[in-house]
UniProtKB/Swiss-Prot annotation:
PROSITE patterns from the UniProt entry: RIBOSOMAL_L9
Function comment: Binds to the 23S rRNA.
One GO location term (cellular component): ribosome
Family listed: Belongs to the bacterial ribosomal protein bL9 family.
Signal peptide: none
Protein name from the UniProt record: Large ribosomal subunit protein bL9
TM region(s), chain numbering: none
Entry keywords, A to Z: Ribonucleoprotein, Ribosomal protein, RNA-binding, rRNA-binding
UniProt record, GO biological process: translation
A molecular function GO annotation: structural constituent of ribosome
Organism the protein comes from: Phocaeicola vulgatus (strain ATCC 8482 / DSM 1447 / JCM 5826 / CCUG 4940 / NBRC 14291 / NCTC 11154)
Length: 147
């Protein structure tokens, strides 16, 4: 019996896979629990259309991320903070301050996608990575200066 999985099933397959199982397993467990549907020609056609639409949507999201990366690649930030006499920062500069500076420049970026590798605790030049998409990221240089 050929079925289309509606969710991941351990030791069988992943969501939207077309797999062959024994009739009893399909009719008595997978289909009644909603984990699968029978792979009729119409169901296969609907699956193909759904996958095509999803691929188109993911492509659009990736293009939007690439456009945003193109805007951000030439951006250089300057972050002013309170500094002690020795040049160390009170606290640290994090992705929150970087997101705020980007917003001041007109780029709305969620702070959760900004990665700062090391703790920024001194005045100097650093780099942050903005992960816009799983395949698209951009490195933004920023400088921390005394206020």
């Amino acid at each position: 019996m050929e079925i289309i999985l509606k969710e991941d099933v351990v030791n069988l397959g992943y969501k939207n896979d077309i797999v062959t199982v024994k009739s009893g397993y399909g009719r008595n467990y997978l289909i009644p629990t909603g984990k699968a549907v029978i792979a009729s020609p119409s169901a296969k056609k609907m699956l193909a259309e759904e996958l095509k639409q999803r691929a188109h949507k993911l492509e659009k999201i990736k293009k939007d991320a690439e456009a945003m990366a193109e805007q951000l690649k030439d951006v250089t930030l300057t972050i002013a903070t309170k500094v002690s006499a020795t040049g160390t920062i009170f606290g640290s500069v994090s992705n929150i301050q970087i997101a705020e500076e980007l917003e001041k420049l007109g780029h709305k970026v969620d702070r959760k996608i900004i990665v700062v590798k090391d703790a920024v605790k001194e005045v100097g030049s650093y780099k942050a990575i903005v992960k816009l998409h799983k395949e698209v990221s951009v490195e933004i240089p920023f400088e921390v200066v005394a206020e």
